[in-house]
Swiss-Prot record:
Residues 1-26 are annotated as: Disordered. It comes from Mus musculus. GO terms for cellular component: cytoplasm; SCF ubiquitin ligase complex. Residues 8-26 have a biased composition (Basic and acidic residues). This is F-box only protein 9. The gene is Fbxo9.
Amino acid sequence: MSAEAEEDCHSDADRVGDEGNESPAERDLQAQLQMFRAQWMFELTPGVGSSHGETRPCRAGRSSMLKAAADTKGRQELAKEEKARELFLQAVEEEQNGALYEAIKFYRRAMQLVPDIEFKITYTRSPDGDGVGSGYIEENEDASKMADLLSYFQQQLTLQESVLKLCQPELETSQTHISVLPMEVLMYIFRWVVSSDLDLRSLEQLSLVCRGFYICARDPEIWRLACLKVWGRSCMKLVPYASWREMFLERPRVRFDGVYISKTTYIRQGEQSLDGFYRAWHQVEYYRYMRFFPDGHVMMLTTPEEPPSIVPRLRTRNTRTDAILLGHYRLSQDADNQTKVFAVITKKKEEKPLDHKYRYFRRVPVQEADHSFHVGLQLCSSGHQRFNKLIWIHHSCHITYKATGETAVSAFEIDKMYTPLLFARVRSYTAFSERPL
């Protein structure tokens, strides 16, 4: 087959030489036909054509086509890389100016064009055109700045304004804007936001408004007062925490913006029936509620009523629920690095009015006694929430007789009836503030 192809190519060449008086269009057509035949024969027998039967015009046409395709692909790759380089350097400049969201957009577009564009850039020159990215420093100064967002925002406010303003009005208004207030007044407002209930969650949400509010919300004095209110004298030293805010967030503590709830269910046998084939069984359910306050007070209630009807009554200590137990608690951290909560609670005392008018009765001595309950709980975390679980470790009843001063202690066995208490946040508990921090 290769011999036939060579004979066809020679015959075509002789025919072109004999017919020298043909028009240029016909000569181009014959040349294209000759190239097509040679390429077709080369595709049918690639091994033979590459070694013996491939003619010089066939090799020249194929090499020119491959070279043109390679040049086109190379130009496209260079253009794509140059565009990615410009986008990346523009993102660097936006990041230096503080426009982080715009920088992220340019970074994303550059990475979509060339994934490893970061390693192909030389930072000694700026791209051709508008000169974006000039003055870029390869050191990690900007990275360290962004790691400490507080100092970064403080520096930005100092560079932008000759007179320090924490915020600026977004729209023009005839009313007085909050940016006019001095720093001392703003900090006092922030202390009202935290309030005596230690609503640090609202403070964190307030810090998202602007850079100035972020700086105010990170004020060390606010977080120091919050730590002192929770742990008292036991938190005088900041070590091993880096800041008061880190201590408040990381150190184990009970939560105040909700209530700890547990549900206990068991089945007991009912009364005997006259019918021997029927036995009554009852499913009993009851709840335990524990509410902690920052000033050291605690409330505990055991009732069969469900949370929707009980939780609103536990907002303050001045509740009218008769079965409520009131007391104080303290936090204790053992050598095994486990935090425990110990509380002493008593039933709310009720003064009964005595009516002695027109009554005569014999005085009978009644032995008065005070009842108190001692509770021990282990504080731990579960799931994605922190410090949201209390596990029973101790429960006892102490009866003190006033006449003799003796105290009788009855300890309860901690079994499966003492289910762990899980925390549930209640928004109404921090809906308004009564006193500042």
